[in-house]
């Protein structure tokens, strides 16, 4: 099927590539179908809505930038996403891309969790955590 995207123009996708977010994403509850589209020559991935061309979230796998990042999924999430083991899980965080780019932040408090095998996804809001919605991707530069 052909879809229009925010960053990649019109592209062809396969039904098997669609990730289903049964509950939508907070703020976009009506959006249930997305595809993951790598941004060429970057570590970034676009979580693109299948139905709304203007809706594409910039994601990263958090461990490259936050090596100690760790979450625990509750039983409800494991059940909703049909996760049976760590091998099923793909974990991403949404970026708020800033200008200048060095001020870009990552939302570590609400990761995107995907069962890569079943193609089911959910944005998980972590509670009782020190993670916040805005963690700098790059350390602040000290003025000379």
Curated annotation (Swiss-Prot):
Q: Does the keyword Cytoplasm apply?
A: yes
The record, for InterPro entries, names:
Flagellar_assembly_factor_FliW, Flagellar_assmbl_FliW_dom_sf
Coiled-coil spans in chain: none
Q: Which UniProt keywords apply?
A: Bacterial flagellum biogenesis, Chaperone, Cytoplasm, Translation regulation
**In its UniProt record, which GO terms are filed under biological process?**
bacterial-type flagellum assembly; regulation of translation
Pfam families noted in UniProt: FliW
Which GO cellular component terms are attached?
cytoplasm
Q: What is its main location?
A: cytoplasm
Tell me which SUPFAM superfamilies the record gives. Answer: BH3618-like
Is Chaperone given among the entry's keywords?
A: yes
Q: Where in the cell is it found?
A: Cytoplasm
- Which function does this protein serve? Acts as an anti-CsrA protein, binds CsrA and prevents it from repressing translation of its target genes, one of which is flagellin. Binds to flagellin and participates in the assembly of the flagellum.
Q: How does it assemble?
A: Interacts with translational regulator CsrA and flagellin(s).
Family membership noted in the UniProt record: Belongs to the FliW family.
Output this protein's name: Flagellar assembly factor FliW
The gene designation is fliW
